């Protein structure tokens, strides 16, 4: 392998090398320092006379006397069934004290977009055990659904709870979770590792942890390693895989950092103009392929800077993905966990995975009625602030009380509370029983007579 000493400039995580031979985009590079140690990098850009290399570690010690070796290969992820139960670094190295992974295959981490013609329609309900997701914003197998959160909100706890509890009820098919955390603190890393080991969820999971003090370049690689692992488990070993990515905001900040080092012309709020395309290359790797038994479902968590849902990161994510789950600061202040606000939340594929044969025949109608009742109660809170509660009619006071009950009984649940979909539906009916039947306008009469607590007691 030829070694060149043609480095002209080092800027942040980037090394600029005078071109001496044809090199490929994303080709791996070994950098040999004066003391004989090696660092690894990847070709980020190439022109007629200059190659830009992004280094996976710090660039400390790299100078004009550093040797550069182009390997002719791209980054490949060693994959195998033995990965289940392992905790890896953001670069795919063992972090749990275990041995290196014995690969059954080595796959390129860039993956390939699923051919639209080959995509199957998402149909199967995934139970997370969280009522506000399962009943009102259902996650469907093969869907990509982001969780919009904010700084200081318990999105990590929600992510861990979903990773522990997610399952396809009534199915004996193989299910796995791939969990990738980007830009987390050492404290969060310890929390994630301890929680996975405490609950036994690690048995059917592969965990990737990238720390805040790890290089920004590694943060770009981490979700691609996770998705490559998920695709292997899903499409070659027939697993149904749930991929949880947190925090995509840290990923986008790494994109911005590298773009600034390359002196690119910035887009909105300093983020690269290609951020939409880059995010799509990750999100679109979720799905189902016709003729394959497995599936890849994505839950990506991002913190909205300043709780601004119009910020480029949540804004662009919303265009690519199929809905959003919104974590709310007001609910968090009330001490409600998980503080998920169902009103701005949406699952665009919900109707494909609910109803008779999937969950229960009353699922859609109960969800609509709960949503309508809660929305009316929240609107009335604004009116009460102006005219006072005494000015409300008896009907309005009923909906005001319903909104309080909805938050405190339906939204609120324990961090280890795993509700089945039947339990969530029965709880929904229990809340609706206090609303006069003539006001349950979104539920068919036959469903009321079958599932309403008043009629169920008579039947018993």
Curated annotation (Swiss-Prot):
**Cell membrane found in the keyword field:** yes
Q: Which cysteines are joined by disulfide bonds?
A: none
Bilayer topology: Peripheral membrane protein
Identify the InterPro entries for this entry: ATP-synt_VA_C, ATPase_a/bsu_AS, ATPase_F1/V1/A1_a/bsu_N, ATPase_F1/V1/A1_a/bsu_N_sf, ATPase_F1/V1/A1_a/bsu_nucl-bd, P-loop_NTPase, V-ATPase_su_B/beta
- According to its UniProt record, where is this protein located? Cell membrane
Q: Which GO terms describe its cellular component?
A: plasma membrane
Q: Which GO terms describe its biological process?
A: proton motive force-driven plasma membrane ATP synthesis
Gene3D superfamilies to which the protein is assigned, alphabetical: 3.40.50.12240
Its biological purpose: Component of the A-type ATP synthase that produces ATP from ADP in the presence of a proton gradient across the membrane. The B chain is a regulatory subunit.
Assembly notes: Has multiple subunits with at least A(3), B(3), C, D, E, F, H, I and proteolipid K(x).
In terms of NCBIfam families, this protein maps to: PRK04196.1
This one is known as A-type ATP synthase subunit B 1
Its ancestry begins with: Archaea, Methanobacteriati, Methanobacteriota, Stenosarchaea group, Methanomicrobia
